[in-house]
């Protein structure tokens, strides 16, 4: 039998509950021209009371099944113009509908569907799955507070076969890695940024700008590329250029795993393999991260 006595020796740091991976396909029909948004949404609520944890009293709990249904209904009545706006709609609903909800955290991930196109003509209702970067967002709002909005890109896998090297690093008794002036550079981009505010922000267009900037700084000019002396330098260059192009972004976090491709030794077969046949290695892999933010002076 559950105890009804509160333990005075411990205190809550944070609580939350909700529903994860609520999937929705929303279809906007404008005559024969259809537009779609498929999303997976996770919602976490924090309540003012902790009586459900301490005493097993469920009288304040909004069931997670209700949370799931709410996501479905908001998609119907509000639509999904962008995943960021949809997440803000969810936050606003729970904070305005339930006085004992003090915090709402919403994560939304968009399935990368792209409209079919041929010879410049777009199909009116057919789409193809194009995994060239997944658009996600996180929105958190507290009672009497403004929403804090993060957007991001993940699962954007890119590779270039040259214009990358790694030299001049520390060498000790455990170092076996040779310096290299020319190598393959492959990574799977994770990029997340925070907006200063939500007013007059075109979230879809901003996401496209950031993604294009990532590809631009990774690849360089189409006819010759751009040399990368390290993953760190490429990461930083992406951040600096992005913040210069999008003034609404306050800070940006990037994670770039260094996905390795090694030359296969064919000497025992009497063959010389000049970086033509390489072995992809899933792990271990290097992982480079960095977060930058605008200096206060740059916002004045």
From Swiss-Prot:
The modification Phosphotyrosine is found at residue 285. The modification Phosphoserine is found at residues 35, 59, 228. One of its GO terms (cellular component) is peroxisome. GO terms for molecular function: urate oxidase activity. Pathway: Purine metabolism; urate degradation; (S)-allantoin from urate: step 1/3. CDD domains: Uricase. A motif (Microbody targeting signal) lies at residues 298-300. The keyword ATP-binding does not apply. Gene3D superfamilies: Urate Oxidase. It is an enzyme of class 1 (oxidoreductase). The lineage of its organism: Eukaryota, Metazoa, Chordata, Craniata, Vertebrata. It comes from the Eukaryota. Its main location: other. This is Uricase.
């Amino acid at each position: 039998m559950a105890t009804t006595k509160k333990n005075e020796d411990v205190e809550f740091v944070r609580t939350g509950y909700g529903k994860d991976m609520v999937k929705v396909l929303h279809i906007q029909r404008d005559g024969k021209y259809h537009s779609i948004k498929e999303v997976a949404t996770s919602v976490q609520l924090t309540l003012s009371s902790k009586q459900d944890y301490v005493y097993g009293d469920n009288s304040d709990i909004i069931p997670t099944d209700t949370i799931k249904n709410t996501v479905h209904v908001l998609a119907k009545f509000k639509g999904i113009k962008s995943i960021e706006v949809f997440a803000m709609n969810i936050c606003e609903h729970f904070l305005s509908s339930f006085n004992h909800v003090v915090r709402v955290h919403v994560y939304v991930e968009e399935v990368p569907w792209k409209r079919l196109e041929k010879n410049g003509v777009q199909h009116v209702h057919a789409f193809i799955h194009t995994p060239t970067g997944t658009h996600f967002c996180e929105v958190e709002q507290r009672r009497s507070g403004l929403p804090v909005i993060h957007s991001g890109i993940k699962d954007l896998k890119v590779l270039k076969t040259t214009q990358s090297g790694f030299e001049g690093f520390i060498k000790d008794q455990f170092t076996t890695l040779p310096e290299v002036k020319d190598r393959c550079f492959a990574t799977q981009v994770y990029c997340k940024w925070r907006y200063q505010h939500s007013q007059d922000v075109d979230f879809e267009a901003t996401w496209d700008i950031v993604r294009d900037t990532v590809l631009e700084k990774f690849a360089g000019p189409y006819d010759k590329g751009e040399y990368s002396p390290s993953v760190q330098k490429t990461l930083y260059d992406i951040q600096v250029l992005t913040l210069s192009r999008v003034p609404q972004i306050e800070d940006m976090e990037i994670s770039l795993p260094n996905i390795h491709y090694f030359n296969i030794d064919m000497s025992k077969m009497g063959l010389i393999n000049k970086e033509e046949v390489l072995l992809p290695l899933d792990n271990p892999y290097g992982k480079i991260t960095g977060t930058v933010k605008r200096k206060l002076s740059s916002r004045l």
